[in-house]
Amino acid sequence: MGNLLRHLPQLDALLSTAAMASLLERYSREEVADALRAALQEVRKGVQAGHMDSLPDFESAGFVSGVMAGIEARRRPNLVAAINATGIIIHTNLGRARLAPEAMAAVQAAGAHASNLELDLATGRRGSRYAHVEALICELTGAEAALVVNNCAAAVLLSLMATAQGRKVIASRGELIEIGGSFRLPDVIQQSGATLKEVGATNKTRASDYAQAIDAETAVLLKSHTSNYQIVGFTHAPQREELASLARETGTILMEDLGSGVLVDLSPYGLNDEPVVSDVLKSGVDVVMFSGDKLLGGPQCGIIAGRADIIVSLKKHPLCRAVRIDKLSLAALEATLRLYRAPHDPFQKVPVLRAISQPVEEIEARARRLAGELTVAGIVDVMCIPSRAYVGGGSLPQQNLESCAVTVIVPHLSPDALAAALRAARPPVIGMIREDRFVMDVRTLIDGDLPGIVEAFRQVALR
């Protein structure tokens, strides 16, 4: 091994070979050097692992081709459009909500041009970026005032820091949630400078538990919608109206972290456990916090809505600037919110809601069309099967939607190998493996995805 490593050529020597001359004509010296350095490192690892008993020919066409492939790989963007065939509508790893065309157009306009982000066009003086969406949020939720920050965790942190720093926050033991990435609500409360007071039991908490824990140091009663898990069986949780009455009597603030946050009723589509934001505020909750890129169907952001006096105090807090929403997300959010107003039907215009409400007959027709196009392209083992799709994004874990899927077997590739190859295709196709078949749930596809899927299979299965 040591003898082989001693014979590895120097980088400068390789760059001077005739084999590299053609690459240096097409690419910069820095690009070629970086790719060569990576190739040499791979050879070194192979020797050290005992996988190589001789060095490759560094001037061969195969080695040069590998270096060129490395250069091209470095030139490709890391963040690419992908096709979500998982059956999970709001897939966190795939970017959550797909934006509506109107939202994308708004992002393009805001990014390509100067805008009145913080300019009052009527007076010519400095304005507030929040003014572009605050009235819309209030109209759609019934809130007195609203504020938008960069994500829901920031919304919770800001809300608690501005109202409860140095004081107590009371929360039920059954609602001390953990979201993705191991971020836990107790940690957020601690970071806000407040002290957490847990009440009740994991499965049962009553309004009297909150009442007994309130003292002069208590600032906030905090509810959290357990959107990513459910506690069932011998359980009890107080009604929001009970806690709202208690908060009024004791001069405390009732806040609720709704997580996903939905502006419309999903029960007609069999999804019954997601509270509508306007209903939560009507019940007497003072402040709600929810995400913009989940069931709302907009960009990543955290929306805070509720009592005007509390929202004003949040806007004045120093943390507000540190977590403020950027102009592109703001543009996308405004455009998305407008799709909830007449004459628009959000279930037709907002992609997330369209995916949830889409009739299964349409999904089955799309599945048959995809299966037919794959068959025409030469993929012979293709089949349509019933499936179940999920909302995702930490929402409605116990509920699913009737769907249809297309399954594929490629003879020379195992399901795992096929899935890996499709992830490496352009566009990458992300599906599932069930019963030794690669499966694509069609509820999370749109008609425009089908040509990309066929092209990906051409790249992978027919080569």
Curated annotation (Swiss-Prot):
EC number: 2.9.1.1
Compartment(s): Cytoplasm
N6-(pyridoxal phosphate)lysine PTM positions: 294
Example GO BP: selenocysteine incorporation
Pfam families documented for this protein: Se-cys_synth_N (PF12390), SelA (PF03841)
A single GO molecular function term of this UniProt record: L-seryl-tRNA(Sec) selenium transferase activity
Chief location of this protein within or outside the cell: cytoplasm
Keyword NADP assigned: no
Keyword Cell inner membrane assigned: no
Protein family according to the UniProt entry: Belongs to the SelA family.
HAMAP family: SelA
Role of this protein: Converts seryl-tRNA(Sec) to selenocysteinyl-tRNA(Sec) required for selenoprotein biosynthesis.
Record's protein name: L-seryl-tRNA(Sec) selenium transferase
Organism the protein comes from: Hyphomonas neptunium (strain ATCC 15444)
